[in-house]
From Swiss-Prot:
GO terms for molecular function: rRNA binding; structural constituent of ribosome. It comes from Malacoplasma penetrans (strain HF-2). Gene3D superfamilies: 6.10.160.10, Ribosomal protein L20 (1.10.1900.20). InterPro entries: Ribosomal_bL20, RIBOSOMAL_L20_CS, Ribosomal_protein_bL20_C. PANTHER family: 39S RIBOSOMAL PROTEIN L20. This is Large ribosomal subunit protein bL20. The lineage of its organism: Bacteria, Bacillati, Mycoplasmatota, Mycoplasmoidales, Mycoplasmoidaceae. Binds directly to 23S ribosomal RNA and is necessary for the in vitro assembly process of the 50S ribosomal subunit. It is not involved in the protein synthesizing functions of that subunit. PROSITE patterns: RIBOSOMAL_L20.
């Protein structure tokens, strides 16, 4: 006797359509288009999880650079001094300090650069 796959197929297709719910137009109603849309979205999500790390690092560096240039120093010179003095503070923390407490950041920069 032949095994029919009606319920299985319906369940699988329903699953793809459920994942494509937020898609635009036919991409959320047609099974074939929904599947392609979801697969492409998954690729983008995977790629952008990697890019997110790069983007945040770039953002932190830009913020630190802007804050340091106000004190007439360069980012590269500042980072070099930090490494020389073996001060282990990451860029995320420096960036937050520059935004949240500009006065404290200013004191920190001068203490690193002048000693």
């Amino acid at each position: 006797m032949r095994v029919k796959t009606g319920p299985t197929t319906r369940r699988r297709r329903k699953s793809w359509l459920k994942k494509a719910e937020g898609a635009w137009g036919i991409n959320s109603t047609s099974y074939r288009n929904a599947k392609q849309t979801v697969m492409q979205a998954s690729k983008y999500a995977y790629r952008d999880r990697k890019n997110k790390k790069r983007d945040f690092r770039k953002l932190w560096i830009a913020r630190i650079n802007a804050a340091i240039r106000k004190e007439n120093y360069t980012y590269s010179a500042f980072m070099h001094k930090l490494k020389q003095k073996e001060i282990a503070i990451n860029r995320k923390m420096l960036s937050e300090l520059a935004i949240q407490n500009p006065e404290e950041f200013k004191k920190f920069v001068h203490s690193v650069m002048l000693k």
